């Protein structure tokens, strides 16, 4: 709605500390929102009920990126328990200071520490009726418009991590001497470095192909994006593991960056 854009967009643009978080994932069923279910039993546990001109939200969200510090939340909730998740869920704009909203905890994560991870609880959280963003059946199409580019960006981040690990390793094996010669001159090491390069190039090519398909509106773009997420994360993990092994004991030291 225009009035919500006028109120919140300037703060989101002008204040770097004014963060927005998407509250989707739940303790039971994780991100079922993105799976091709449409049975009532697969709908969200977080409920939103319209009572006397106000939406009343009850439920819990967890693993929410920026959830601990966010000042504004886009919350996804079940608004029609008679149908499945694709047709019976809606999104709402919920300010952090709304009565009934509690940021319960900040989760410590092994990776992705560039943003925090929070758990959000809604206990009779009351919203004005006009804080509804997208209702029921229109939600799936609308959310895909921002989530698909986000998935491609995540794959690009993975690629960047892999490239950094490869570059550090390539420099290390040229400098470190064992058996009277640099590690790179040992064929077993060179072969592993080549394998790392092949994996990264496959991710890079698939990433470009998928981004082009999304821009062109190719029907299979959504499927390609899902495949890209898997391919990028798995191949980059293998690259980073090999990078650590080629560093030897130094690969476990924090000062090296590989760990």
Ranges and model annotations:
Residues 34-58, 255-257:
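Cytochrome P450 C-terminal beta-domain/meander region
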Residues 50-55, 121, 148-259:
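Alpha-helical interface subdomain recognition
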Residues 62-67, 112, 149-154:
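Glycine-rich phosphate/pyrophosphate-binding beta-alpha loops
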Residues 21, 45-47, 54, 72-76, ...:
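Conserved hydrophobic/aromatic beta-strand scaffold that supports enzyme active sites
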